[in-house]
Amino acid sequence: MNKITYMTIKISIPKYMSRIYHGLFDTGANICICKKKVLPDELWHKTENLVLRGFNDEKHVAEYRADNITIMIAKEKFIIPYIYAMDEMSPDIIIGATFYNKYSPIELDIGKGIIKFTKNNEKYPNYLVKYPKKRKLVPWTKGNPSVTETMENIGINQIESRNPIEEEINQILGTDIYGENPLEKWEKHKTLAKIELKNETDNIYKPPMLYQETDLPEFKMHIEEMIKEGFIEEKTNFEDKKYSSPAFIVNKHSEQKRGKTRMVIDYKDLNKKAKVVKYPIPNKDTLIHRSIQARYYSKFDCKSGFYHIKLEEDSKKYTAFTVPQGYYQWKVLPFGYHNSPSIFQQFMDRIFRPYYDFIIVYIDDILVFSKTIEEHKIHIAKFRDITLANGLIISKKKTELCKEKIDFLGVQIEQGGIELQPHIINKILEKHTKIKNKTELQSILGLLNQIRHFIPHLAQILLPIQKKLKIKDEEIWTWTKEDEEKIKLIQDYSKNLVIKMKYPINKEDMNWIIEVDASNNAYGSCLKYKPKNSKIEYLCRYNSGTFKENEQKYDINRKELIAVYQGLQSYSLFTCEGNKLVRTDNSQVYYWIKNDTNKKSIEFRNIKYLLAKIAVYNFEIQLIDGKTNIIADYLSRYNSSDTDGRYDEANT
């Protein structure tokens, strides 16, 4: 009598993170079969077409076979002699007679949930699965086999299907844009990068590091993988060994979470001595604003972005690095070289610039956006053609198609709204409040920069802390209780942020309101909009800053005037269309802007210069009571001793 049951099995493949599946053990199946994505692509080889008969005698043709696959049940290893690929089945994997014959006899007691193998005469309770799941099948992740990859489950009786529109978009896109090696289609663009030193006679040399024994197999894995892919080569010319940077292994929390270490090269000396590529990286706010009136979004990621670009032959020597196994150099544009982002951005701009009315590119991240489904189909088809024509390789694993809400550049974008991604807040909350050095401070300030438009008066809070970045390396690092309290305060604010900001979609609703205020050492503003025929004012974003040293000597009126200018300038990207109203509670500033004057004092000449800069912007000015200017007042007047609250409302 045939017996079938599901059992937890782990598939372990060298150089890949392991995966756990609920395999169907079927004593009536003649062979082992699985869906093709259950195993890495390179394990499959073409075979003579094998006709498989399934339930109800339906026929399927198997074209691929893999041999000697290691699986684990409990902590014991077993070998599947051979297995065929077949996607037209519900379970991810079926274990059949080729396995049982190797390890027979096998005792299977479904009632007690026990399976027993003669391999070691041991029983394995609790590995039989009562409510099996199947996996969402994605490309395998390279890494340490001792680490198990986290995968999404799909109920075994569920149909794994896309939204019909998403499926249609996927059909338009096709599969030819995807791949694993970014050099696969390099001949289509033949892009080369050049590294130049400021002084050609300079040495770039740092001695090799001391390595832990546990690092050796990690280096071996990374080096073998990158040589195979064509990214690096062994350096045989030792005459120019004046170029050498040390490599090291990073295995921190994020690496442990993804189950794979990183090999990092210390290119500080190279970055100091190389000429700077002065090609700009686009402003994230500018990019996001371009897409905010769209409704449908598809996101793509260039596979191992920088590696699309090869290095000129004379530039390779500058990238030379040492590992325990020897001496190597890059054949492609390396990570860690400070010009790599600019070089790659220039490469991407050259390809996509004519299509920036519906495509956003930030280094290796790409967003296609459209207002309608039909428009999105056209845009996706165009993106496909551009990608194929220029030899770009896209990561299938990171592709998201036809979403009405999507994560991009640290925020969630949807039509008429920007929302802060929760993981950004979590990262801030996880940071220690005791900062040990400038590197740790730069790390948390980089995170806080991502929420600067969501937290009022942030510049004021950070002012004393940011000054510590000017401390020279040889000076003693100090971190006081007051500094610690400021980080704690920001973390407290982060727990209760208004994380979603609304923006107008229609031009008729673009009635912009900018509220400004200033204190002795800081200025602040907030941007709102008021839809047509509505009394509600929706909050869009905050902006704050601190006065320069010479500006701190100004009287409060001139500081308020600077606040007006900074508010108009910082929001100009959003307010270039529609009407603008600036609100201030400073009557002198209101008078200066509202009335033309011909005073000729030296002091007023400076003010007139600032007024001339402000006059570039077309806006109305409104004088309001200081008590009603709550948001802007909070922005600039922060003081931990006189406020324990915050303005949480997103509208008034």
Swiss-Prot record:
- Identify the Pfam families for this entry: Peptidase_A3, RT_RNaseH, RVT_1
Gene3D superfamilies the record matches = 3.30.70.270, Acid Proteases, HIV Type 1 Reverse Transcriptase, subunit A, domain 1
| Sequence ranges assigned to domain Reverse transcriptase in this UniProt record | 231-413
| Reaction equations catalysed | DNA(n) + a 2'-deoxyribonucleoside 5'-triphosphate = DNA(n+1) + diphosphate; Endonucleolytic cleavage to 5'-phosphomonoester
> Which stretches make up the Peptidase A2 domain?
21-99
Which residues does the annotation say bind Mg(2+)? Answer: 301, 364-365
Specify the protein name: Putative enzymatic polyprotein
Check the record and name the CDD domains matching this protein: retropepsin_like (cd00303), RT_LTR (cd01647)
Which source organism? Cassava vein mosaic virus
Leader sequence range is: none
Which keywords fit this entry according to its UniProt record? Aspartyl protease, DNA recombination, DNA-binding, DNA-directed DNA polymerase, Endonuclease, Hydrolase, Magnesium, Metal-binding, Multifunctional enzyme, Nuclease, Nucleotidyltransferase, Protease, RNA-binding, RNA-directed DNA polymerase, Transferase
| EC number(s) from the headed UniProt entry | 3.4.23.-, 2.7.7.49, 3.1.26.4
Q: Which GO terms describe its biological process?
A: DNA recombination; proteolysis
Q: Where is the active site?
A: 26
Gene Ontology MF term list: aspartic-type endopeptidase activity; DNA binding; DNA-directed DNA polymerase activity; metal ion binding; RNA binding; RNA-directed DNA polymerase activity; RNA-DNA hybrid ribonuclease activity
Its function, per the record, reads: Encodes for at least two polypeptides: protease (PR) and reverse transcriptase (RT). The protease processes the polyprotein in cis. Reverse transcriptase is multifunctional enzyme that converts the viral RNA genome into dsDNA in viral cytoplasmic capsids. This enzyme displays a DNA polymerase activity that can copy either DNA or RNA templates, and a ribonuclease H (RNase H) activity that cleaves the RNA strand of RNA-DNA heteroduplexes in a partially processive 3'- to 5'-endonucleasic mode.
The cross-references to SUPFAM superfamilies, in alphabetical order and at most eight, read: DNA/RNA polymerases (SSF56672)
